[in-house]
């Protein structure tokens, strides 16, 4: 019985490792913070991590600890609990242009034709790479704080709609919706 329990534990940890291996994580920012105490300053670290499966799921997390590896581990765990799904067109770009904001940071994301690549700065690039977007043009205006930029990017991605969901909301066919799209052809497959 004990041997079965032990073996089951190993299998569960192996399953967890396989599930974790499907995610790609990017360290966006590390910040050294100090707490002033009676004896001087006590230093710690805060980490911002973005993870994704490069197939449309992405999340971000923030972790704080006295040591850098522990802060990164906490941030990664928080990111896994904060995963969201984003509908991608052809598995490589956004369905439409979108804007997002958080605090004083604003971001504008534009769908791009194949071969454009990721044209985005800093923290936004990490989000797109882990999400699996290959072609996008992004611009950030206002705050360049990495936390605000990541949260503004997630705010924008939260509002991305696939043609299928828009058609369902409007009670029309997907082909009708795509035929109306400027410069689009009606043969594009909706996700």
From Swiss-Prot:
Record's keyword annotation contains Amino-acid biosynthesis: no
Which controlled-vocabulary keywords does the entry list?
Answer: Ribonucleoprotein, Ribosomal protein, RNA-binding, rRNA-binding
Where is region (Disordered) located? Answer: 1-20
The cross-references to Gene3D superfamilies, in alphabetical order and at most eight, read:
3.30.160.20, 3.30.230.10
Q: Which PROSITE patterns match?
A: RIBOSOMAL_S5 (PS00585), S5_DSRBD (PS50881)
List this protein's GO terms for biological process: translation
Q: Which NCBIfam families match?
A: rpsE_bact
The record's subunit annotation is: Part of the 30S ribosomal subunit. Contacts proteins S4 and S8.
Report the sequence similarity comment from the record: Belongs to the universal ribosomal protein uS5 family.
- Comment on protein domains: The N-terminal domain interacts with the head of the 30S subunit; the C-terminal domain interacts with the body and contacts protein S4. The interaction surface between S4 and S5 is involved in control of translational fidelity.
Please explain the role this protein plays, according to its UniProt record.
With S4 and S12 plays an important role in translational accuracy.
Q: What protein name does the entry list?
A: Small ribosomal subunit protein uS5
């Amino acid at each position: 019985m004990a041997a079965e329990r032990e073996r089951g534990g190993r299998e569960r940890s192996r399953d967890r490792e396989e599930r974790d291996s499907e995610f790609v994580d990017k360290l966006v920012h590390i910040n050294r913070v100090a707490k002033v105490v009676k004896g001087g300053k006590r230093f710690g670290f805060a980490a911002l991590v973005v993870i994704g499966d490069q197939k449309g799921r992405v999340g971000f997390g923030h972790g704080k600890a006295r040591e850098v590896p522990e802060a990164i581990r906490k941030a990664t765990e928080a990111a896994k609990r904060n995963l969201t799904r984003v509908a991608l067109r052809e598995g490589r770009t956004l369905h439409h242009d979108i804007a997002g904001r958080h605090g004083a940071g604003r971001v504008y994301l534009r769908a791009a034709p194949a071969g454009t690549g990721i044209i985005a700065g800093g923290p936004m690039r990490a989000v797109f790479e882990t999400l699996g977007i290959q072609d996008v043009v992004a611009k950030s205006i206002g705050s360049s704080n990495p936390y605000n930029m990541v949260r503004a990017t997630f705010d924008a991605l939260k509002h991305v709609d696939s043609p299928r969901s828009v058609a369902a909301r409007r009670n029309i066919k997907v082909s009708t919706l795509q035929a109306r799209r400027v410069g689009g052809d009606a043969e594009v497959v909706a996700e």
